[in-house]
């Protein structure tokens, strides 16, 4: 037998040099389309454009402010500064911070480590010492909630005393932290805008209002002056910053407001006739067609469609205009009716920075209790389908967030339960009030409506028109207006006289029973202390109700009902390389 045909068996899989090489990370080309630079732009050109786009010099002048009335004139007013960027502008964050540090002289100086004492601010391990008069900069990349709002939560982690917000912003009033807005200077081709504008609005006498997002609003004044001679009824919306807010805008000065009634949607209307100023602002807006530069977020777009006669959006990148389709208001009307038959409401907090958030939560909670419903407050960060799906016993969600991007509009029916706004929930709780077609998302407007309703109720009580005597009969049955089915848990906090559970004080013979029997009585009851227990009713509909429930047999098997559930035993403890029984075996 020859050995020529024999093959040595492989003791391992085939390996070559590529097996032991590190995986190569493909470098990504950063696309900065908002800067308007060619793809082959040099680093110097990019830095120069960034300084012009974000007004780096004006930001430095703003940060160079000193504390007034202090003994030392060199103490900076803002020592801990956080820079907040949206995802689309995070690519410029490192360059912006480097330019700010270079111009403000914030580069740390290095000293001999032997002369440095260990402390909280400086450590001998690094040998770097921060001057007590210097400033510190942090980058906030991942916002806690909506990117258009000031992120006070993330800024509080570094004890920030100023937040500089870059990009588009909602300009809503912040709770406490000072803020500054830097919108940037995006390029806008006015010729393309004018061409599309004239094609859509052939009638020169039409009442038209021009609006844009915060960065493109800086170009509206120039566009307005060009189109005004041909369109006499033309107006535009400039930015409006509430004087009560501790915020400022860097690089742009909005036009002053002509009248307080023209301040709406965080904008001030410019160019209206003097006769229209005395008219109700809602009536004025309904008479105008809106031409909006840049496509707003879905909540903002839905809000605009309810305030104007028609809405046209213009996309600056593509240069095309669109008149729909837009989010439908009928779905909001349907969700409002579903909220009327809901028994458990989940208040979903989607912001922690806006003013009056806590006040709105407390007042809405009180309204829910008065309506005989239950509510729970949830703070889960950025909401998504998976997070909200964990709470099955919630019948409907009420989201409290920014009116620009903080309101959840479920266009694709991804969420398992309907999501409404505070305004829609208040309409559902007050059955005597009909929906006029408006869609209100402003916190202050909702609080004003609640205050007016409370005043009317007090006036009715004083006039004696309110009857405080309770009817002896049960309340009228509640039906779901969408499905038509009877709903028995729409008001779980209402007083019941036909369903209740006995306590040990009322029946002392329960003391002789076992603790397990008492638990079973409470778990099977649907009413506790004269109110419906939605948790107990939801638990009864589940197949798995806890440990040992999978050992229970059918109700017809009397012997099986008396059997105990699974016994709880000590499990395996330790880590994978050495559990308890492994150690005992090793030492034996």
UniProtKB/Swiss-Prot annotation:
NCBIfam families: diphth2_R, DPH2. It is found in: Cytoplasm. GO terms for cellular component: 2-(3-amino-3-carboxypropyl)histidine synthase complex; cytoplasm. Keywords: Cytoplasm, Iron, Iron-sulfur, Metal-binding. One of its GO terms (molecular function) is 4 iron, 4 sulfur cluster binding. Component of the 2-(3-amino-3-carboxypropyl)histidine synthase complex composed of DPH1, DPH2, DPH3 and a NADH-dependent reductase, predominantly CBR1. Residues 454-485, 546-588 are annotated as: Disordered. Gene3D superfamilies: Diphthamide synthesis DPH1/DPH2 domain 1, Diphthamide synthesis DPH1/DPH2 domain 3. Its cofactor is [4Fe-4S] cluster. This is 2-(3-amino-3-carboxypropyl)histidine synthase subunit 2. Residues 466-477 have a biased composition (Acidic residues). Binds 1 [4Fe-4S] cluster per subunit. The cluster facilitates the reduction of the catalytic iron-sulfur cluster in the DPH1 subunit. It holds the Pfam family Diphthamide_syn. Pathway: Protein modification; peptidyl-diphthamide biosynthesis. Residues 579-588 have a biased composition (Basic and acidic residues). It comes from the Eukaryota.
């Amino acid at each position: 037998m020859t050995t020529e045909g024999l093959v040595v068996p492989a003791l391992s899989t085939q390996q070559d040099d590529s097996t032991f090489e590190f995986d190569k990370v493909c470098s990504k080309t950063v696309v900065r389309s908002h800067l308007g630079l060619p793809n082959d732009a040099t680093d110097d050109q990019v830095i120069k454009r960034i300084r012009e786009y974000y007004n780096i010099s004006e930001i430095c002048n703003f940060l160079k402010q000193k504390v007034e009335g202090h003994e030392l004139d060199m103490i900076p007013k803002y020592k801990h500064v956080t820079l907040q960027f949206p995802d689309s502008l995070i690519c410029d964050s490192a360059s912006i911070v480097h330019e700010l540090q270079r111009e403000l002289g914030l580069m740390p100086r290095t000293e001999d480590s032997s002369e440095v004492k260990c402390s909280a601010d400086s450590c001998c391990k690094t040998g770097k010492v921060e001057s007590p008069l210097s400033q510190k900069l942090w980058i906030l990349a991942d916002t806690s909630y909506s990117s258009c709002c000031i992120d006070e939560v993330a800024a509080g982690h570094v004890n920030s005393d100023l937040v500089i917000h870059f990009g588009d912003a909602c300009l809503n009033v912040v709770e406490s932290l000072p803020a500054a807005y830097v919108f940037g200077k995006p390029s806008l081709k006015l010729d393309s805008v004018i061409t599309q504008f004239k094609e859509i609005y052939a009638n020169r006498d039409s009442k038209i209002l021009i609006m844009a997002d915060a960065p493109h609003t800086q170009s509206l004044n120039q566009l307005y002056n060009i189109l005004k001679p041909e369109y006499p009824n033309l107006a535009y919306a400039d930015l409006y910053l509430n004087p009560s807010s501790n915020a400022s805008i860097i690089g742009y000065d909005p036009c002053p407001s002509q009248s307080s009634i023209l301040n709406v949607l965080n904008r001030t209307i410019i160019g209206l006739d003097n006769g229209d100023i005395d008219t109700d602002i809602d009536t004025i807006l309904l008479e105008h067609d809106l031409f909006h530069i840049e496509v707003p977020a879905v909540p903002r777009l839905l809000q605009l469609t309810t305030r104007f006669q028609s809405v046209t959006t213009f996309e600056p990148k593509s240069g095309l205009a669109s008149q729909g389709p837009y989010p439908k208001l009928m779905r909001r009307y349907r969700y409002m009716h579903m909220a009327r038959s809901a028994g458990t409401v989940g208040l979903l907090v989607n912001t922690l920075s806006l003013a009056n958030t806590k006040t709105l939560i407390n007042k809405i909670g009180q309204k829910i209790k008065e309506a005989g419903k239950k509510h729970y407050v949830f703070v889960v960060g950025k909401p998504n389908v998976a997070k909200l799906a964990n709470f099955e016993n919630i019948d409907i969600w009420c989201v409290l967030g920014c009116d620009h991007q903080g309101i959840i509009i479920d266009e694709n029916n991804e969420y398992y339960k309907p999501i409404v706004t505070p305004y829609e929930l208040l309409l559902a709780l007050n059955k005597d009030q009909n929906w006029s077609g408006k869609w209100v998302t402003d916190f202050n407007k909702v609080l004003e409506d609640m205050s007016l309703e409370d005043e009317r109720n007090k006036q009715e009580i004083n006039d004696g028109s309110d009857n405080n005597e309770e009817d002896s009969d049960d309340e009228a049955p509640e039906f779901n207006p969408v499905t038509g089915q009877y709903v028995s848990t729409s008001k779980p906090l209402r007083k019941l006289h036909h369903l209740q559970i006995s306590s040990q004080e009322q029946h002392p013979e329960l003391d002789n029973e076992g603790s397990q029997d008492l638990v079973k009585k409470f778990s099977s009851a649907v009413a506790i202390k004269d109110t419906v227990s939605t948790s107990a009713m939801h638990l009864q509909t589940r197949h798995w109700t806890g440990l040992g429930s999978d050992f229970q047999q059918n109700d017809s098997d009397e012997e099986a009902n008396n059997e105990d559930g699974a016994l709880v035993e000590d499990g395996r403890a330790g880590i994978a390389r050495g559990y308890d029984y492994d150690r005992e075996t090793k030492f034996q």
